C-alpha cells in the first residue's frame, strides 16, 4: 500500500527532488545541444555522427530503464537509484575526456544507462508515496520541475561552451549527479514496502512487459506517449542545426529560442492540471489530441524558410507533449498499481525508444534544411493519434 509520503521529506521537497530525477534525460541531452556543431569540429567528424550521439543516448536510456523497474520492484527503489546514479556520474566524466567520436558514443551510452534510473524510479516513488487521487496532480507538479532542465540547460550549456568548452558541460552534469546521489543517500527513505515478495528472473521481466502490452489501453497509451516523445526528440536533435546553421542564430542565443517551447510546456501543464481536476482525464486527452492533429497538419503546411512558421506549430506540439505525459502515466499507474516499477520502466523506455527512432530517422534523412524535421514530427503526431484511438472503448469517455 502507498504510504502518505516519504517520512524524511515534506511533500514539496520530495516532488522537487523526484522532478529533478525525471529530468535527468532532458538535462543530459539539452545541456550539450549548443555544442553539437563544435563537437563535430573538435572530434574531426561529421554532423551526422554527432547527431548519432543523441540516438545513442536514447538507446542507453531505453535499455537501462527496462532493468531498473523490475529490479526496484524486487530490491527497493533506493538502492537501485543509488547504483544507477553512480554509473551516470562516472560515465559523465568519461564523456568529458573523450578524444574521438567512438569514445564519446560509448560514454554517452553508459551515461544514459545510468541516468535511465531517474525517470523510472522518480515516478514509481510517486505511486509508493501518494494516494491514488493525488497522483495526476503530483505528476503534473513534477513535470513543472522537470521542465526547468530543458529551460535552463541550453542557456547554461551555451555559456559553458563560450567560456570553458564543451568538455566542461559533461563535468557539470557529473557534478549535478553527485549532488543528487548525496541527497538520495542521506535523505531518501525506502518507499517500496513489499519489495521482498516478488520472485525475479529474466523470464519474469518479459512476462511483466508482455502482460502490460497485451492490454489494449496500456498498449495505446504507451504508443501515444512514445510517438509524442519521438516528435519531441526530433525537435531536440534537429533544432541546433536548423536554428544555428540554417537560420544563423548564435549558439549562445540558442537557449532563448529553445526556452520559448519550454514555456509552452509549462503553460500546457498548468492548464492540464486545472482541467483534470474538473473533467475526466480521457476527455482532457481527447481535446489535447485534437490539438496535436492540428499541429501535425501545420507542420506539412509550414514554410520551411520562415522561422516563425516553424516555431508556432513547434510551440503547440512540444507544449502538448508536456501536458499529455502525466495523464498517460497516471492511467498506466492505475492499471498496474502492483507493478508500478515495471509499468513506469516500460512506458519510459518506450518513450525514449520513440525518441531513438525519430531522431535516427532525422539523422538519416537530414538534408540541412528544416523540412526533414517537420516531416518527422508530423509523422509522430499521426502515430500518437492512432495510439490514443486504440485506448478508446465504449463508455471510456464517461468513466
Predicted features, each with a name:
Residues 2-7, 191-221:
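Juxtamembrane intracellular "pre-TM" segments in multi-pass secondary transporters
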Residues 44, 76, 97-103, 114, ...:
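Helix-breaking motifs and short loop linkers at transmembrane-helix boundaries and internal kinks
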Residues 63-102:
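Conserved MFS/SLC helix-loop-helix module at the cytosolic interface between two early adjacent transmembrane helices
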Residues 79-93, 283-298:
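Structural signature of the two symmetry-related core transmembrane helices
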Residues 87-94, 102-110, 308-314:
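Paired small-residue
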Residues 103, 132, 140-186:
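Helix-loop-helix hairpin linking two adjacent transmembrane segments in secondary transporters
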Residues 107-148:
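Cytoplasmic helix-loop-helix junction between adjacent transmembrane helices
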Residues 333-371, 376-377:
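A late C-terminal transmembrane helix in Major Facilitator Superfamily
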Amino acid at each position: 500500500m502507498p504510504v502518505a509520503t516519504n517520512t524524511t521529506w515534506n511533500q514539496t521537497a520530495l516532488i522537487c527532488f523526484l522532478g529533478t530525477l525525471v529530468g535527468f534525460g532532458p538535462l543530459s541531452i539539452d545541456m550539450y545541444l549548443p555544442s553539437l556543431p563544435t563537437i563535430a569540429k573538435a572530434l574531426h567528424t561529421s554532423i551526422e555522427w554527432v547527431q548519432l550521439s543523441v540516438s545513442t543516448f536514447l538507446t542507453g536510456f531505453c535499455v537501462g530503464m527496462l532493468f531498473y523497474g523490475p529490479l526496484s520492484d524486487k530490491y527497493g527503489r533506493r538502492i537501485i537509484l543509488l547504483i544507477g546514479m553512480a554509473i551516470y556520474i562516472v560515465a559523465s566524466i568519461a564523456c568529458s575526456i573523450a578524444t574521438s567520436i567512438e569514445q564519446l558514443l560509448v560514454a554517452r551510452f553508459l551515461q544514459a544507462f545510468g541516468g535511465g534510473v531517474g525517470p523510472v524510479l522518480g515516478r514509481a516513488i510517486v505511486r509508493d508515496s501518494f494516494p491514488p487521487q493525488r497522483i495526476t496532480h503530483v505528476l503534473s507538479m513534477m513535470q513543472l520541475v522537470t521542465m526547468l532542465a530543458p529551460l535552463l540547460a541550453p542557456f547554461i550549456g551555451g555559456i559553458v561552451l563560450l567560456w570553458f568548452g564543451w568538455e566542461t558541460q559533461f563535468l557539470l552534469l557529473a557534478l549535478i549527479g553527485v549532488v543528487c546521489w548525496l541527497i538520495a543517500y542521506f535523505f531518501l527513505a525506502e518507499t517500496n514496502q513489499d519489495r521482498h515478495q516478488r520472485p525475479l528472473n529474466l523470464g519474469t521481466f518479459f512476462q511483466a512487459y508482455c502482460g502490460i502490452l497485451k492490454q489494449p489501453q496500456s498498449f495505446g497509451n504507451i504508443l501515444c506517449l512514445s510517438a509524442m516523445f519521438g516528435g519531441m526528440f526530433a525537435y531536440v536533435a534537429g533544432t541546433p542545426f536548423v536554428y544555428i546553421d540554417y537560420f544563423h542564430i548564435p549558439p549562445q542565443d540558442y537557449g532563448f529560442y529553445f526556452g520559448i517551447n519550454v514555456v509552452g510546456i509549462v503553460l500546457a501543464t498548468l492548464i492540464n492540471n486545472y482541467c483534470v481536476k474538473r473533467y475526466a482525464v480521457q476527455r482532457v486527452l481527447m481535446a489535447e489530441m485534437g490539438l496535436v492533429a492540428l499541429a501535425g497538419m501545420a507542420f506539412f503546411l509550414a514554410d520551411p524558410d520562415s522561422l516563425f512558421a516553424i516555431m508556432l506549430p513547434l510551440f503547440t506540439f512540444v507544449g502538448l507533449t508536456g501536458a499529455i505525459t502525466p495523464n498517460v502515466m497516471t492511467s498506466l499507474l492505475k492499471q498496474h498499481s502492483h507493478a508500478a516499477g515495471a509499468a513506469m520502466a516500460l512506458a519510459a523506455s518506450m518513450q525514449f525508444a520513440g525518441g531513438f527512432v525519430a531522431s535516427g530517422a532525422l539523422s538519416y534523412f537530414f538534408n540541412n534544411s528544416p523540412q526533414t524535421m517537420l516531416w518527422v514530427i508530423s509523422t509522430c503526431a499521426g502515430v500518437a493519434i492512432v495510439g490514443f484511438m486504440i485506448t478508446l472503448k465504449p463508455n471510456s469517455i464517461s468513466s
